[in-house]
Amino acid sequence: MKEAWGPAGTTGCITSLRELLGLVGAHEWHQKGMEISALGSAPHNRIHPSYGVFSPVRGEYIQLVADAPLPSTELAFDIGVGTGVLSAVLAKRGVKRVVGTDLDPRALACAKDNIQRLGLKDKVELIQVDLFPEGQAPLIVCNPPWLPARASAPIERAIYDENSAMLKGFLAGLAGGGGAGDHLT
């Protein structure tokens, strides 16, 4: 439970069975990791999701990033880095510098752990910021929340995007007519 809620306090804790089962499952995934074929061969292809960070259980979007032609290998932005899986795939494909961003400190800690485990810390920089870092990149990836509804728990923020706010912010930041929103070169 320390992974999910931090160090234990002196008082007891009450939680639902659903939440407890989620904690147990998240702990198992974090301990064992998940094989990601786009990261190469075992055992050096595992991502270790943390509680509250979206787990890359569906690999279609990961494989798309692994297989798509790269416009450049100098720099890429990974918006909403989560576990760091897309940053890791890009770095393993030869992108020299990947900047991963997220607002959630738990996601950034998870991504940092995964990037270090994979030996990619010299290629991937992680920044706590809302959407885009400063500057421009020839490649920008993002796996945004896809359901336009309100999240009722922290883990759901990776799935639910109230009023499509993240998606709209991401699209607006790609090319904003020469202003601060021009992040894609």
Please place each PLM-identified region on the residue numbering.
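Conserved SAM-binding loop and adjacent beta-strand
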Residues: G25-E28, S50-A66
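Conserved SAM/SAH cofactor-binding pocket of Class I
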Residues: R58-C142, P148, S152
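Helix-to-beta-strand junctions that scaffold the AdoMet/dcAdoMet cofactor pocket
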Residues: L120, G178-A180
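Mobile active-site "lid"/loop adjacent to the S-adenosyl-L-methionine
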Residues: P105-A107, P144-G169, G173
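A short mid-domain helix/strand-loop element embedded in enzyme catalytic domains
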Residues: W29-Y51, A68
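Conserved beta-strand signature within the Rossmann-like core of class I S-adenosyl-L-methionine
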Residues: G181-T185
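N-terminal auxiliary segments of SAM/dcSAM-dependent transferases
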Residues: M1-E35
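A structural alpha-helix within SAM-dependent methyltransferase catalytic domains
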Residues: A88-A91, L171-A175
